[in-house]
Amino acid sequence: MYDDYFTFRSVTTAMRGSRILEAMGIQSLTVRTPKQLQQQGCGYSLRVRGDTAARAKHALKQAEIQYSRIYRKDENGQWREVTE
């Protein structure tokens, strides 16, 4: 199983997103964004299970919670941006 990381520029926005996901029954964990993924800002992410990522993306968009990008670590340990 893989995890997806929704990156945010602020911890406040990440925590707002976490509350939205919790209300929708989607488990998430607020974590520091891995250094290699940080673009700018303080670098926090919501880590969600890959099988709930599509629902999480939809819930965040519906609630107008703006994330920066979504990343997933592949089987070789390389990070890639999720664009689907």
Predicted feature residues:
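Amphipathic, hydrophobic secondary-structure cores in small proteins
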Residues: 2-22, 26-57
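Absolute protein N-terminus
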Residues: 1-2, 84
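C-terminal structural segments of small proteins and small subunits
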Residues: 53-84
